[in-house]
Amino acid sequence: MMLHAQHMPGQPGAPSLVFLHGFSGDCREWQPVGEQFHGCSRLYIDLPGHGGSAAIPVGGFADVIRLLRATLISYNILKFWLVGYSLGGRVAMMAACQGIPGLCGLVVEGGHPGLQNERARAERRLSDGRWAERFRHEPLTEVFHDWYQQPVFASLTAQQRQALTALRSQNNGETLAAMLEATSLAVQPDLREALNALAFPFYYLCGERDSKFRALAQEVAATCHVIRNAGHNAHRENPAGVVDSLAQILRL
């Protein structure tokens, strides 16, 4: 089994870029950024529970990474960079720490390296469980209206919240809930030590108004690029800034 994806071929010898979206996004999320790198091969993946992969069930990160590997093999992508936002960033970090073959570099935007104690994990398990129940049983427009009131999204304008709520409400609540539980921070290990031991380039992107993730970026051995005029979802709020950072990272 493999994940649904959109593949855009590039020039021979150029890097292959594999893009992983955030929770409730899909393969279109990174395209405004990725399509600025038309010389590179670009693979935009739908994670389980999302988009064209909505019907693919997973029990945890191990299943997600197994599906990611199978998808890369199916497209004959043997050497690549992983670029992931939020949930996609956490999947990318997990894959990197588990030694996914062919990985040349890692770029994470607003991805959490992991909670550091059992109390925090227990609190997160309860919180994600409550959200999952809402995704299963309530209209998605109502759930996402409240979702985007969370402190991490404080930099969004009312208009941006409204647009995101309308976009994300096109998802399937049941499959979103299942993926939320399977990949919760409550079940993710603390990756700091493993990330600090990576033998390939690791870069971290965060919006200048995203104080929580700017602080987390200092806890991992990554080169940090701060994206101006952006909050947690920097590639949506300032795509040109993220394109500039990726161009510097990839030396294109």
From Swiss-Prot:
Its catalytic activity? 5-enolpyruvoyl-6-hydroxy-2-succinyl-cyclohex-3-ene-1-carboxylate = (1R,6R)-6-hydroxy-2-succinyl-cyclohexa-2,4-diene-1-carboxylate + pyruvate
Query: Per UniProt, what is one GO molecular function of this protein?
Result: 2-succinyl-6-hydroxy-2,4-cyclohexadiene-1-carboxylate synthase activity
Q: What is its EC number?
A: 4.2.99.20
The pathway it acts in is:
Quinol/quinone metabolism; 1,4-dihydroxy-2-naphthoate biosynthesis; 1,4-dihydroxy-2-naphthoate from chorismate: step 3/7; Quinol/quinone metabolism; menaquinone biosynthesis
Q: Which leading EC class covers this enzyme?
A: lyase
Q: Which UniProt keywords apply?
A: Lyase, Menaquinone biosynthesis
Q: Name one GO biological process term.
A: menaquinone biosynthetic process
Protein's UniProt name: 2-succinyl-6-hydroxy-2,4-cyclohexadiene-1-carboxylate synthase
Q: Which domain of life is it from?
A: Bacteria
> InterPro entries of this UniProt entry?
AB_hydrolase_1 (IPR000073), AB_hydrolase_fold (IPR029058), SHCHC_synthase_MenH (IPR022485)
What interactions and quaternary structure are annotated?
A: Monomer.
Q: Which organism is it from?
A: Salmonella paratyphi A (strain AKU_12601)
Q: Pfam families of this UniProt entry?
A: Abhydrolase_6 (PF12697)
What family classification does the UniProt entry report for this protein?
Answer: Belongs to the AB hydrolase superfamily. MenH family.
What the protein does?
A: Catalyzes a proton abstraction reaction that results in 2,5-elimination of pyruvate from 2-succinyl-5-enolpyruvyl-6-hydroxy-3-cyclohexene-1-carboxylate (SEPHCHC) and the formation of 2-succinyl-6-hydroxy-2,4-cyclohexadiene-1-carboxylate (SHCHC).
Q: Does the keyword Iron apply?
A: no
